[in-house]
């Protein structure tokens, strides 16, 4: 029961952070590529890898921080909807391909780098 509460609280925090970062970025910059989601997924993937690599044996780290906060922060449902928008917008196929490669490739590498730091 405690773990469910930790995941719920962490997920709420992560989702609020994601929404805030996205809103602030979009107010300051005008770009057709959804850069905030890319940055959030890369940083979140790095943090997840870092915590995994540290092999922390603290009971609340995984449910609250990794699954909760970082899981709520790095949402691939947002990524999927952005990819559909790019794919279904005329003349955006190149951005669709670029964004797909950046999201999956760079997020994976960031997670791997975080893991191997420890």
Swiss-Prot record:
GO terms for molecular function: fluoride channel activity; metal ion binding. It comes from Staphylococcus saprophyticus subsp. saprophyticus (strain ATCC 15305 / DSM 20229 / NCIMB 8711 / NCTC 7292 / S-41). Fluoride-specific ion channel. Important for reducing fluoride concentration in the cell, thus reducing its toxicity. GO terms for biological process: cellular detoxification of fluoride. The chain crosses the membrane at residues 1-21, 29-49, 95-115. Na(+) is not transported, but it plays an essential structural role and its presence is essential for fluoride channel function. It catalyses: fluoride(in) = fluoride(out). The keyword Secreted does not apply. It is a multi-pass membrane protein. Na(+) binds at residues 71, 74. This is Fluoride-specific ion channel FluC 1. The keyword Membrane applies.
